[in-house]
C-alpha cells in the first residue's frame, strides 16, 4: 500500500503543479552555470544522457521550466585574468600534441571517468613520445589546418603572453638573483667579520680606538654590523688576545691605553700572524734567563716589538711610526720593579732609546737614567706597586683613569743614553703613555 501511494505521489506532484516554484528541478546547476550556447548544448546532451534516470513527467516539467526562462538575462562570465574586457580572448591555434591530447582525453574520459586529470595528462604525454612519425602525421596535418584557419579568422592576431601580476620573477631568474645577492652578502659579512677579528684580535685594540680608526679610515662599505655581533667579536678578540698572552701563566698587559691613532689603516688591515719564538734572536746573551716575550701575534705589523732586557727587572716597549722610513722617532719606556718597591714615594720612569733594527747591540748594556718628578706623589704614579710587584707583568698593569698622570715628559738632556742608538736615528722624543 505504501509503495503504491509513494509512486502515485511521485507521478502526481510534478504534472499537476504548473507553478515553477513548486516544480522539483533536478538540474539547477546545469541551468544556471550554462550562460552561452555551447554550454546549453552540453546541458541538453547531459539531459539526454540522463533520460533513463528520471521518469517522463519530471523531464517534461524540467524542460517546461527551462524553456520559460530567458537565458539572455544571465550575465556572461568575466575572465579574471582577461586584459581588456571589450575584446574576447583569442586562443592560440592548437599544435599537433594538443590535437592528439584533446581527442584522446575526451575518449578516455568517457571510457574511464575515474581517471585523475593529472595522471591522464602524464599518460598522454608518454604515449605521444612513443608515437612514430606515421602515427603523428594525422595530428600534424590537423594542427596545420587549424593554424591556417586561425590565420584566416584572426589576421591581426599576435601572440602576447600574459604577464604575471604578482611581480614574482621566473624561478630560474629568482634563484640566480637570490644566489648572487646571497653571495654578495656573505662576502660582505666575511669582510666585516675579518675586519673586526683583525682589530679585536690584537691586544692593543679596545672599543674606543676601534671606533676612532673605523671612522677615520673606514672600509668602503658602511658599518652596518649589528651591535650584538660587534660586541661578540670584541669579547672574542679580547679572549683570543688574553689566551695568546696568558699561555705562560702571566696576566696579559692591557694595551688599551696605548694610543694607536697614528697607525695607518693599511698596516692594520694587512696584519699577519707570525711565530712568537722569532723574538728569541733579539734577546741579549744574558737575558735568556728572563721571561720570553709574549706580546701578541700582530705586533710586527703594528710596529710594536717587545723584548726583555737584562732579566725581569727591566722591560722595554718600542713604538715605531710606520709612516716614516729612514728617520723614525722611537718612544720607549723601561721601568724597574725594584724602584717601586724600594722608593714608593716618587714615581720614576726609565727611558731608553732603542734602535729597532739593532736589538742585539742595544740591549746588553742599557743605562737607565732616572727622571724624578718630585711634585707628583704616589697617587699620580703610573703603575700600581707594592701589592703587585711580585711578577713582571703585574707590576705594569695600568691603573684606573682617575689615577693616571696627565703630564708628558719631554727631555732633550744629553745624559740620555744615545751611545747605543744607531747613528741614523734622530734624537728620540720621550713621552709617557697617557691618554688625553
UniProtKB/Swiss-Prot annotation:
Annotated source species: Xenopus tropicalis (Western clawed frog)
SMART domains: HMG
PROSITE patterns noted in UniProt: HMG_BOX_2
GO CC annotations, alphabetized: cytoplasm; nucleus
Protein name (database record): Transcription factor Sox-10
Its job: Acts early in neural crest formation, functioning redundantly with the other group E Sox factors sox8 and sox9 to induce neural crest progenitors. Acts downstream of wnt-signaling at the neural plate border. Involved in the specification of neural crest progenitors fated to form the pigment cell lineage.
Region (Transactivation domain (TAC)): 327-436
Domain of life assignment: Eukaryota
Cross-link (Glycyl lysine isopeptide (Lys-Gly) (interchain with G-Cter in SUMO)): 44, 331
Start-end of Basic and acidic residues biased regions: 145-159
